[in-house]
C-alpha cells in the first residue's frame, strides 16, 4: 500500500452507529475526536441498516431513511450557531467547531444490504490491509465480550483491521 493511501486511512475515522436517533451526543463525540486527533481529515459515520445480528437487540427502530435524514439534518446544523446550541456556546467562547459537512460523510454502504451485517464483515469490506481508526462506545466494547453477539473470528478481524478509539457510554465502565 502506498504511503499516501496509508496516510489517507489514518486521517479518516470511522464511527459505526445505529443512530436511534442520532443526536448531539454522537456529534459531540466526533467533534472531540477532531480536536484530539488534529490529523483527522474525515469522520465517516457508518449508519447501520438496523438489521442487527445481535440476538439481544429486539427493539424496533425507525426506518433507515428516517435515521439517515435525522443524522444529515443534525450534521447540517451542527456548526451553525443560529441552529445549534453547542455551536452557539462555542462561538460565545471564541471557538469554532471543527465538525462540518466538508470533513464528514455518512456511509450508505450498509443500507444497501438487506440482511444482518456483522461489524467485522463491514470493516473488512473497506479496511484493506491497513488498520483504520474507529470510534466505539463502551457499550459496544462490552457487547464485544459476549460470544452470542461477537464471535472469536469477529474479534480477530476487528483487532486486525482497527485501532479502536473508546468513548464512555451510558453507565458502562
List the predicted regions and their residue ranges.
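Nucleotidyltransferase catalytic core that binds NTPs
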Residues: 1-173
Amino acid at each position: 500500500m502506498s504511503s499516501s493511501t496509508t496516510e489517507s486511512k489514518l486521517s479518516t475515522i470511522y464511527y459505526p452507529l445505529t443512530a436511534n436517533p442520532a443526536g448531539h451526543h454522537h456529534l459531540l463525540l466526533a467533534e472531540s475526536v477532531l480536536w484530539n486527533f488534529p490529523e483527522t481529515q474525515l469522520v465517516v459515520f457508518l449508519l447501520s441498516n438496523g438489521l442487527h445480528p445481535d440476538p439481544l437487540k429486539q427493539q424496533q427502530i425507525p426506518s433507515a431513511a428516517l435515521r439517515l435524514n435525522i443524522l444529515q439534518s443534525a450534521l447540517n446544523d451542527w456548526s451553525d450557531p443560529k441552529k445549534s446550541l453547542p455551536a452557539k456556546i462555542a462561538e460565545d467562547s471564541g471557538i469554532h467547531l471543527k465538525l462540518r459537512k466538508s470533513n464528514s460523510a455518512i456511509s450508505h454502504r450498509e443500507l444497501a444490504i438487506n440482511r444482518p451485517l456483522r461489524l467485522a464483515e463491514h470493516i473488512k469490506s473497506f479496511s484493506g490491509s491497513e488498520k483504520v481508526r474507529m470510534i466505539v462506545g463502551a457499550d459496544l466494547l462490552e457487547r464485544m465480550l459476549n460470544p452470542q453477539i461477537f464471535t472469536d473470528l469477529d474479534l480477530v478481524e476487528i483487532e486486525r483491521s482497527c485501532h479502536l478509539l473508546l468513548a464512555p457510554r451510558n453507565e458502562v465502565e
